[in-house]
Regions:
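Class I SAM-dependent methyltransferase SAM/SAH-binding core
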Residues: 43, 49-99
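A short SAM/SAH-binding and catalytic strip from SAM-dependent methyltransferases
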Residues: 109-122
Length: 141
């Protein structure tokens, strides 16, 4: 597969933020035929150091909530600003995926790239802990 969007993110500085397989390539493939509308409010669940959040905001035009339990929101905010994104385009949030701090039906979509396996293994997780935050007709990838 050709990765025209994610190729732009293969710089040494950005590649240092990767902790496993290239999440930007994974995300591009995951969203190849996505149905989330541009300007949607999206949660990047398990966003890590924010590389996938930047990708979602820049390449798809989403307003992104970069939610991660282990990353420092202030460090992520500085990274997002350095990438030319405003605080309105991308919002870093320290959040436990099993106790999300958002209003019900807040997101048009949730994208979780290479992290869902850590918190989604509980059979009740999707219905009880994640779906309540997705608008009716919203998407999870």
């Amino acid at each position: 597969m050709n990765y025209p969007r994610s190729k732009k993110y293969c710089t040494p500085a950005l590649l240092q933020k990767i902790m496993g397989p290239n999440p930007v390539k994974l995300e591009e493939e995951l969203l190849l035929h996505h149905r989330i509308p541009q300007n949607a409010v999206v949660c990047d669940l398990g966003s890590g150091q924010g590389l996938t959040s930047v990708f979602l905001a820049k390449e798809y035009g989403f307003t992104v909530y970069a939610a991660d339990l282990w990353s420092d929101p202030e460090e992520n905010r500085a990274f997002f600003r350095a990438q030319g994104l405003t605080d309105a385009e991308i919002i870093p949030v320290k959040a436990d995926a099993t106790a999300l701090p958002f209003e019900r039906e807040f997101f048009d979509g949730v994208v979780s790239t290479d992290s869902y396996n850590y918190f989604g293994r509980d059979p009740a997780y999707l219905d009880e802990k994640l779906l309540p935050f997705v608008k009716k007709g919203g998407y999870i990838y």
